[in-house]
Amino acid sequence: MPTLSELAPKALQVLHDAQSPIGTRAAVVPMANYQAVFCRDAVVTGLQGLMEHDSIRSEGLKTSLQTLRNHQGAQGQIPSNVRLEAGQLKVSFGRLSPKIDSVSWYVLGCAKLVQHGESAPGPWLNSMQSAIAVLETLEFNGSNLIYIPRGGNWADEYLTEGYTLFDQALRAWSLLEAGRTFNQPNWIRKSNLILQVLTSHYVLDDGLFASSLLPGTVDRRMDLAGHCVLAMATEPGTPAVVRALKVISDNTILKGQLPPAFLPVIYPDDPNWSALEGFHLFGMKNKPHHYHNGGIWWIWTAWYAQALRRHGLEAELQSLLELTELVLNSHTDFDFEEYLTSDTLAVGGTPKLCFTATGIRILHFLKNE
């Protein structure tokens, strides 16, 4: 029965094995798509490497960012992923839809790399200015929000679109960190404007933040990753954020359930099912309780734990960590798979995934701090 302490060194080995000449690969498996350096995966992996003072992951982050910078689009856009194929570099900015979140992940990664003393600021400033400018252009109407196409962020085969909580919060966080690191007050001011919109217009009656605002409607689904990123972007103890984090705990952890990526689950009798069923690249993964459709992702479980710690919710954090150990104890053959199904807690998706290995490392350190 594996514990966090037993899995932590194995997770580290996965993360070290994922390093390549062009950066940190998404997973240590012989599958072409997961051999790519994805911007979001590389940054998420690298951020924890910086926190742990791990030179291998820190260098992997730097190499990943260099690769992405070298293939930045003419308008400032950042690739979703870059991969080596038959000795040639293949660059993708998104296939089903453009991956807008890559731009903010890149800005955040560069800022953190410089903050931790792993690079001088000079090599990154021009590319970051271009990246931030393209987001300003995408804002288009001066609302401080960016309209995200369906599948335009990490949930790339899910029905999230519009003025998504996740992408606005990620942009705000990246601007805040970049503004502080590169001494750019205008970036910090912009971050504050975005956060003001989120805390004033996205809060629902139940205490959660809306997953997205769209013309004429509000997407009221619970977006765990969106709440986690918002928690990182806001000051510790921000009342609306604290309330939302507690509501998530009350609705899941206190009922003996780890929080899925999105709730509620979309079932075949739901009006949205046909759209979800047809929205995929390599086959439909979003069966009920699977993948984005109610799947439990270790990386977002870990970031939720970080959010609880950041905002002073220690009792909720300890309950989460205890539940995490119980769930892991039931998986003797755990191999850092992509997600757990929220109905049976079966493992699903790609094994030896850096997202998952990073989540385990974060949970391990939070438990032992």
Where on the chain are the PLM-derived regions?
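Solvent-exposed loop and edge beta-strand segments that line ligand/cofactor-binding
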Residues: 25-44, 51-52, 56-58, 88-104, ...
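Composition- and surface-driven signal marking solvent-exposed, interaction-prone regions
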Residues: 61, 243-246, 314-323, 339
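C-terminal hydrophobic structural anchor segments
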Residues: 297, 301-331
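Catalytic cores of carbohydrate-active enzymes
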Residues: 5-21, 34, 75-83, 143-149, ...
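Core register positions within helices of long alpha-helical scaffolds
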Residues: 48, 109-112, 174-177, 181, ...
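Aromatic-rich carbohydrate-recognition surfaces in CAZymes
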Residues: 35-142, 168, 241, 298-305, ...
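Short helix-adjacent coil turns
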Residues: 119, 183-186, 311-313
